[in-house]
Amino acid sequence: MSKSYLMNTYGRFNVTFDKGEGTKLYDKDGNEYIDFVSGVAVNCLGHCNPSIVKAIEEQSSKLMHVSNYYWNENAMELTEILCKNSEFDKVFMCNSGTEAIEAGLKLARKYALLHGDENKKEIIYMDNSFHGRTMGALSVTGQPKYQESFKPLIGAVKSVKFNDLDDIKQKISSKTAAVIVEPIQGEGGIIPAKKEYLKLLRDLCDENNALLIFDEVQCGMGRVGSLFAYQKFEVVPDIVCIAKALGGGFPIGAMLAKESVASSFVPGDHGNTYGGNPLACAVAIAVLKELVDKKVVEINVNEKSKYLFDKLMTLKEKYKVINDVRGMGLLIGVEVACDVKKIINKCFESKLLLITAGKNVVRFLPPLNVSFEEIDKALGIFEESIK
């Protein structure tokens, strides 16, 4: 089958996968791989989870799409589950993380217009951040390599140093409409925000009548050991953006907000064609029931996180090539003092899938229901790659 028809926008590994089950992937020749990428934090319950497969089969034979001119029960049920398991009151449904970010940015601008003045438009973002590749999300992504070819981007945006208390104090002002931050910088190298930094952001936003937006696209939906990442940091934003694991492999995203903020939107302010469709929502409901009702997040993530961290710290003590082990839950970065791509490629050759984050960080993103045995097998391969 020809590869020539796909646009050249990704640097792909030389493998074509044909089947998946749990933490395993199989290529077209039947070779088995351990997947510690999880579709980049998407396949939170592994591949072809029975609950997800059942939801797709049942809903796809009943109703898949009706548009947002009409109500559908699955969208109502999903948004109720999300709100009842968070501090938020309203949900905007979409299809991806970058769409959720765009929705959050637009809501912040509309809120500022209604509750500030015409000059209150500024969005503050973090250096080294990543929020997506659409124009709005790209404009608040603090990595020039993604931005340079697409300037001019949207105006009235300003960057600050991540985790630097003094810098944000100096740059936030009455003109600031919102501050957007990842509780854990993912693409930037798995760098957690300091709790005191997020608390300061909350206080400064309140003082300046600005909104605080958390991008939990990668770190949310159970990945760090709580359903929402903000719950671990004990700082509640005004807006939170989620996607990836929400669909467990099926495209879906959402932007959640408090009623006082969400009410700024009126019909026509924002929308999309597929957001909240019955099929995607049925899948997300199935995912959340596994994560919450069956306590995958509460029990498995926290147990396996401690186990994986402890094992990686042992490797750090044993091998000088490991500079740091950091992260939270099952979002873990191992910073190395060598060419990180060589490690990734060695693991790939030994049938373990890992990816990079930042310049020299190996990113571990196993399914949230990963077993101790699968962790041991993956770490055995990883250790061989760093010897």
Swiss-Prot record:
Cofactor(s) annotated in UniProt: pyridoxal 5'-phosphate
Gene Ontology terms for molecular function: identical protein binding; N2-acetyl-L-ornithine:2-oxoglutarate 5-aminotransferase activity; pyridoxal phosphate binding
GO CC terms in record: cytoplasm
Keyword Amino-acid biosynthesis: yes
Binding, pyridoxal 5'-phosphate: 97-98, 130, 215-218, 273
Gene Ontology annotations of biological process type: L-arginine biosynthetic process
Binding site for N(2)-acetyl-L-ornithine: 133
Catalytic activity: N(2)-acetyl-L-ornithine + 2-oxoglutarate = N-acetyl-L-glutamate 5-semialdehyde + L-glutamate
Keywords carried by this UniProt record: Amino-acid biosynthesis, Aminotransferase, Arginine biosynthesis, Cytoplasm, Pyridoxal phosphate, Transferase
Pathway: Amino-acid biosynthesis; L-arginine biosynthesis; N(2)-acetyl-L-ornithine from L-glutamate: step 4/4
Family recorded in the similarity comment: Belongs to the class-III pyridoxal-phosphate-dependent aminotransferase family. ArgD subfamily.
Name of the protein: Acetylornithine aminotransferase
Organism encoding this protein: Clostridium acetobutylicum (strain ATCC 824 / DSM 792 / JCM 1419 / IAM 19013 / LMG 5710 / NBRC 13948 / NRRL B-527 / VKM B-1787 / 2291 / W)
